[in-house]
Design a protein with these regions (language model features):
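Nucleotide-state-sensitive switch-loop elements of NTP-binding domains
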Residues: 2-8, 13, 17-135
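Conserved C-terminal guanine-recognition region of P-loop GTPase G domains, centered on the G4
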Residues: 99, 104-117, 126-179
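Short mixed-charge
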Residues: 180-188
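Conserved small/polar residues in nucleotide/adenosyl-binding loops
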Residues: 190-196
Length: 197
């Protein structure tokens, strides 16, 4: 089965920066990787930002456009079916910043995808400078991403003070509690890069 890794986070959180490092790591380990860039816009800017990763061990596919969730899910499902036939070891999905993780899991459970793919790593990239106030919809997405992640990456932590980093972690905890998520946010699941001097 092909392992699918998911990298979630709001627009500007640092998903593409992490994706570049992660894809380079996987290809250095000998994996044949396909990056699936998923964006609601007509032009997929993130796909342009990772073009230099293309090579013998790394390919890029995109899903762009689509005015509603159903259209987007159908396009993702169709793209995953075609990718399953091409012999990748790993697929790394970077969805748009407005993405419901549960909908992605539903797509992976559909036939025939459930026979070809297995869920691998789920990363939630959260900006250490996360605003204190978000819309109710953004709070829900933040909680959904944090609840589903095996690892939470606090990005741009080198630009944040210790108080701002702690505030972002507290915000995550509040978002999970507001959604009545029983998951306890363990600090061991949050990776905070050390500030650079």
């Amino acid at each position: 089965m092909v392992q699918v890794d998911l990298i979630t986070g709001f627009l500007g959180a640092g998903k593409t920066t992490f994706l570049r490092r992660y894809a380079a790591y996987l290809t250095a380990q000998g994996h044949h990787v396909c990056i699936l860039e998923n964006d609601f816009g007509a032009v997929n800017v993130d796909a342009m930002l990772v073009q230099d990763l293309l090579g013998e061990r790394c390919e890029i596919e995109t899903i762009s456009g689509g005015c509603d969730c159903d259209t987007h899910q159908r396009r993702m499902r169709t793209k995953l079916i075609s990718m399953a036939m091409r012999g990748f070891d790993r697929v790394v999905v970077e969805p748009s910043g407005i993405f419901d993780v549960d909908e992605f899991f539903d797509v992976l459970r559909d036939e025939p995808l459930d026979r070809w793919y297995t869920l691998g790593n789920v990363f939630a990239v959260v900006d250490a400078l996360l605003p204190e106030k978000l819309s109710p919809q953004a709070e829900y997405i933040l909680a959904s991403e944090a609840a589903s992640a095996g690892r939470i990456l606090l990005s741009r932590s080198q630009l944040a003070t210790q108080a701002q980093r702690e505030s972002a972690i507290d915000h995550l905890k509040r978002a999970l509690a507001a959604c009545k998520c029983s998951r306890t946010l363990k600090l061991s699941l949050i990776h905070i890069s050390e500030p650079t001097r």
